[in-house]
Regions:
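Conserved helix-turn-beta segment of the N-terminal RecA-like "Helicase ATP-binding" lobe
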Residues: 231-257
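Conserved SF2 helicase motif VI
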Residues: 202, 325, 482-507, 524
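Post-DEXD/H (motif II) to motif III coupling segment of the RecA-like Helicase ATP-binding lobe
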Residues: 292-293, 300-363, 528
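A short beta-strand element within the Helicase C-terminal
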Residues: 458, 465-480, 506-509
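Extended alpha-helical interface modules used as scaffolds for assembling large macromolecular complexes
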Residues: 1-168
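Walker A/P-loop
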Residues: 195-216
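Conserved interdomain hinge at the start of the Helicase C-terminal
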Residues: 377-416, 422-423
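Conserved helicase ATPase core of P-loop NTP-dependent helicases/translocases
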Residues: 250-253, 258-259, 412, 419-423, ...
Length: 546
C-alpha cells in the first residue's frame, strides 16, 4: 500500500515527487487530473468534472480512472469519491446531438429524467423546438454550439454525433518522401478524425503542424487555419508546401497585410478580431467558402470573439492544436463545447524518451536585490513592484555570466521590459528583437540566428508564439508577463526543439529573491512540473563565483 499518491475526499490528489513510483503515477493520472501546485516535494492535483469528461472523450473510461487512483494511493481511497468519479464520467454521453431525417438536429437522451431536468432550465428552453417523442427534442440547427455550452454548464455535456458537412472537396495528400508521420502524430490524426472534432494536445516542437497536415489529408477539403500571428502563418505555409501536395498558389494568407482567400487559407487571430465601429468585418471569412476543416493553432489563446463565432461553425470539422488546455481566462469549458473535447494527448516525457524533443535542464537562478534596490522595491507602487524586481542590475551580471558559460551555443535571452532588453543587448553586443522591429528585419535576424551567423539574440515577448528558432540550445528568461503558464510552455518549446547533435537544452529563469518575481516564477513552474520536468533552484552567487 505504500503508493506515492494521497487521494483526499475534496478531490485533491497529493503526489510525493521523490517516490520511486511518482513518474508512473503521474502518467496514469495526467489524462484526467489537473496540476494545481508544484513546489519541490509534493504536487497537488485536482480532479474536476471537465477533466473527467475530457478523459472520457479521449477514450479513457471510469474504470481506468478508478484503477489509477486505487493502484497508486497510499491509503484507502474515499469510497464516495470513487462513486462520484464514476457518476461524473457517466454523465458524458447521456445526451447526444444527432441528425434526424425529418427534424434536422435533435437532442436525444438514454435517460429520460435528465432530459426532463434540462428542459425545465430557462437557459435551454429558447434553444430547443418541439418534443418529438419522450426521449427526443428538436434543436434549432443554429443553436448547436450554444446548446452544448449551456448543457455543459448544467453539468450534462452532450456528445455531438450530428456529423459534419464535407465542405468543398480539395485534393490534399501528404508528400512523404524520405519522412513519415511519427507514430504519435498518426495516433493524434486518427483520434481526431474518429472523434470528428476536438483538440490534440502535443508539446511544442513535437510537430503539431504535421498533425494539422495529416488531418487535412484525411479531410481532402478546403481548410481554414487560424494562427496567432503573421510569422506563424508563413511558417505554416512553408511547412505545408514542403510536406503536402499543396502548391504556393493554393495557400492564401489572410492577415493585416494580405487578404487572400484560397482553397487553404491561413488567417491570424488578430485580423479576425479587428473591430470597425463595433463590428468585426473579417469574421465573414468563415462564410467566404464552404470550408471542410477549420484548424485552430494554439487553441488556448483563441480570443473570446472567435468563440462566439465558432458557436455557429458546429457543422464543420474543427481541430484544435495546443501544448496545454489551460487558459489564463478560465474558458476551458468553451474549448470543450465549441471546438470539441480532447481527442489525444501525449505526455512530453514520453515523446522525449522517443528522442523527438531534446531533454531540457530547467534551472531557476535566484538573485539578491542590492540594498538601494530593496528600498526602492519596498516603497514602489504595487503596479510598479514587478518591474522593479524584474529589472534588477544583478540579473544583467547573471545573464552575462550564463552567456559566457555557453559561448558559441545558440542562446536566446527573453524578457518583457524593452529598456532592460536594450541594455542587455548593448552589454552582450547582441541584436534585440522587440515589438517595433519590422517583420522583415525580424525574419532577417531569425535567419541569421538559424544559420549560426549570430549566436546570441535578445527577444521581447513578440517571439513567444509559433516562431521556429530551431537551433536555440539555451534560453535565459529575465522577466516575463506576470507568471502565465502558457507563456512558460511556449518559451520552453522554443528551446526544446530536437537538436541535430543531441545537445541538451538549458532553460534558465533569473528571478529576484523574496519579491513578487519569485511568486510569479512559482506559478509558472507549475506547468513544467505538470509535464514532469525537474526544476533546480540555484543561487546567483554560486553561478558568479569564479
Amino acid at each position: 500500500m505504500n503508493g506515492p499518491l494521497i487521494v483526499q475526499s475534496d478531490k485533491t490528489l497529493l503526489l510525493e515527487v521523490d517516490h520511486e513510483l511518482a513518474e508512473a503515477c503521474r502518467r496514469a493520472i495526467a489524462p484526467f487530473a489537473e496540476l494545481e501546485r508544484a513546489p519541490e516535494h509534493i504536487h497537488t492535483y485536482r480532479v474536476t468534472p471537465l477533466g473527467l469528461w475530457n478523459a472520457r472523450a479521449a477514450g479513457h473510461d471510469a474504470e481506468q480512472v478508478v484503477d489509477a487512483l486505487v493502484e497508486y494511493s497510499r491509503y484507502p481511497v474515499p469510497h464516495a469519491l470513487l462513486v462520484d468519479v464514476a457518476e461524473t464520467m457517466d454523465r458524458y454521453g447521456r445526451l447526444t446531438l444527432s441528425k434526424h431525417p425529418v427534424h434536422g438536429l435533435v437532442l436525444t437522451t438514454t435517460d429520460r429524467p435528465v432530459l426532463e431536468e434540462i428542459l425545465r432550465s430557462k437557459k435551454v428552453q429558447p434553444l430547443v423546438g418541439e418534443r418529438i417523442d419522450p426521449d427526443t427534442v428538436a434543436v434549432h440547427p443554429s443553436e448547436r454550439g450554444q446548446i452544448k455550452q449551456t448543457l455543459l454548464k448544467l453539468g450534462w455535456p452532450a456528445e455531438d454525433l450530428a456529423g459534419y458537412v464535407d465542405g468543398e472537396a480539395h485534393r490534399i495528400d501528404l508528400a512523404e518522401d524520405g519522412w513519415s508521420l511519427r507514430p504519435y502524430q498518426k495516433q493524434a490524426v486518427e483520434g481526431f478524425w474518429h472523434g470528428g472534432s476536438g483538440v490534440v494536445v502535443l508539446p511544442c516542437g513535437a510537430g503539431k503542424t504535421l498533425v494539422g497536415a495529416g488531418a487535412m489529408a484525411e479531410a481532402k477539403a478546403t481548410t481554414l487555419i487560424l494562427v496567432t500571428n503573421t510569422v506563424s502563418a508563413r511558417q505554416w505555409k512553408h511547412e505545408l508546401v514542403k510536406r503536402t501536395s499543396l502548391t504556393e498558389d493554393e495557400i492564401g494568407e489572410y492577415s493585416g497585410t494580405k487578404k487572400e482567400i484560397r482553397p487553404v487559407t491561413i488567417a491570424t487571430y488578430q485580423v479576425l478580431t479587428t473591430r470597425r465601429k463595433g463590428v468585426y468585418p473579417h469574421l465573414e471569412l468563415f462564410d467566404s467558402r464552404d470550408w471542410g476543416l477549420i484548424v485552430y493553432d494554439e487553441v488556448h489563446l483563441l480570443p473570446a470573439p472567435v468563440f462566439k463565432f465558432t458557436a455557429d461553425l458546429q457543422a464543420r470539422r474543427r481541430l484544435g492544436l495546443t501544448a496545454t488546455l489551460v487558459r489564463e481566462d478560465g474558458r476551458e469549458s468553451d474549448v470543450f463545447s465549441l471546438i470539441g473535447p480532447k481527442r489525444f494527448d501525449a505526455p512530453w516525457k514520453e515523446i522525449e524518451a522517443q528522442g523527438y524533443i531534446a531533454p531540457a535542464d530547467c534551472v531557476e537562478v535566484r538573485v539578491n536585490l542590492t540594498d538601494s534596490e530593496r528600498l526602492a522595491y519596498a516603497t514602489a507602487e504595487p503596479e510598479e513592484k514587478y518591474r522593479f524586481c524584474a529589472t534588477t542590475a544583478t540579473k544583467r551580471k547573471v545573464t552575462e555570466a550564463l552567456v559566457k558559460r555557453f559561448a558559441g551555443q545558440q542562446t536566446l535571452v527573453i524578457g518583457q521590459y524593452i529598456d532592460q532588453l536594450d541594455e542587455l543587448g548593448e552589454h552582450l553586443d547582441a541584436p534585440v528583437i522587440k515589438g517595433e522591429t519590422s517583420n522583415k528585419e525580424r525574419e532577417r535576424l531569425f535567419d541569421a540566428f538559424r544559420t549560426g551567423e549570430i549566436s546570441v539574440l535578445v527577444v521581447s515577448k513578440v517571439a513567444n508564439f509559433s516562431i521556429d528558432l530551431p537551433e536555440a540550445t539555451v534560453a535565459i528568461q529575465v522577466s516575463g508577463t506576470f507568471g502565465s503558464r502558457q507563456e512558460e510552455a511556449q518559451r520552453l518549446g522554443r528551446v526544446l526543439r530536437p537538436k541535430a547533435d543531441g545537445h541538451q537544452a538549458h532553460f534558465y529563469s533569473v528571478v529576484a529573491r523574496d519579491t513578487i518575481d519569485q511568486d510569479f516564477a512559482a506559478h509558472r513552474q507549475r506547468f513544467l512540473a505538470e509535464q514532469g520536468y525537474a526544476y533546480r533552484i540555484v543561487d546567483a552567487d554560486e553561478l558568479l563565483a569564479p
